[in-house]
Design a protein with these regions (language model features):
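Active-site neighborhoods and metal-handling regions in enzymes and metal-associated proteins
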Residues: 1-278
Length: 278
């Protein structure tokens, strides 16, 4: 097709044509700086909805199911005049109980660890966020230390991603660097981050897939560019002493931007502590 266009243009005009095989990808991946303020507002809405969903406003331990929380989130977005780009999910982990034993929509009990995956669409933009929560047992004022440590280890994996991502590196090169540092620090994690913006899973380099931790052919070979957004999607699994060494998975996802100067930073902020249901 390019050759036909050049032939139709003739030598003089064809000589002005610059070939760039990545122009379509870069056009979709690159964000206009003025979008960031709008996107930050959307992230604020997401955090507000999640904070309310993971509270006693919505959850009554022993009665509320995970599916009840999902549909509260959908109703809240509908009330705000917004919509999701995928159906939200809420899941639970429980001491001494395998995840498959809990079923698809368990009743939330005290002592449960909760996880949500939630994304909204507004003004032509998409978000994708995952947070973790803990349901306090009677007499508790905070989550057990082992669960707090588990969250800190997942946050450290986020830090590693932000530190290792550089403009010009391919997604696969970033993945390799991130996993090497993860292993050096003794973390048991998985990296599966993706571009976001006009589309929930946007154009640009993938940094892993959950089942492709050795690199993603094609999509992982594209280089990171300045002025793009990422959903920093990942998980770290940590044995928790208070749960008799049972592994607990902390899966986090927040939006980050690659700035004009090549720094990767949070669009709004990340989750720093477990949401607490009292």
């Amino acid at each position: 097709a390019v050759e036909q266009m050049q032939e139709a243009l003739g030598p003089e005009l064809a000589g002005r044509v610059v070939r760039n095989p990545r122009i379509a990808i870069d056009y979709l991946a690159m964000r206009v700086p003025s979008m960031t303020q709008v996107y930050r507002r959307l992230q604020g809405i997401v955090h507000e909805v999640i904070s309310a969903a993971f509270s006693n406003l919505v959850i009554m331990p022993g009665e509320t199911t995970t599916e009840d929380v999902v549909w509260w989130m959908r109703q809240r977005l509908n009330d705000l005049g917004l919509q999701t780009w995928f159906h939200p999910s809420v899941s639970a982990q429980r001491r001494g109980v395998a995840s498959d034993e809990l079923g698809d929509s368990p009743v939330i009990e005290r002592g449960d660890v909760l996880h949500c995956d939630f994304g909204i669409t507004a003004m032509g933009l998409n978000t994708d966020t995952q947070h973790m929560a803990y349901v306090l047992r009677d007499g508790e004022t905070d989550a057990p230390e082992g669960l707090q440590v588990a969250l800190e280890r997942a946050k450290r994996f986020q830090d590693i991603l932000l530190e290792e991502t550089k403009v010009g590196m391919s997604g696969n090169a970033v993945l390799e660097a991130v996993l090497a540092q993860m292993q050096a620090e003794g973390l048991d994690g998985t990296m599966y981050s993706h571009p976001i913006g006009d589309h929930g899973h946007g154009a640009g380099p993938l940094i892993g897939l959950w089942d492709y931790q050795e690199g993603v052919p094609g999509r992982g070979d594209v280089p990171v560019i300045a002025n793009m957004w990422y959903s920093t999607e990942l998980q770290v699994t940590t044995p928790v002493p208070e749960w008799d060494g049972q592994p607990v998975r902390m899966a986090l996802e927040e939006e980050a931007e690659v700035t004009t100067d090549g720094e990767m930073r949070w669009v709004l902020r990340r989750q720093t502590e477990l949401h607490l249901v009292r």
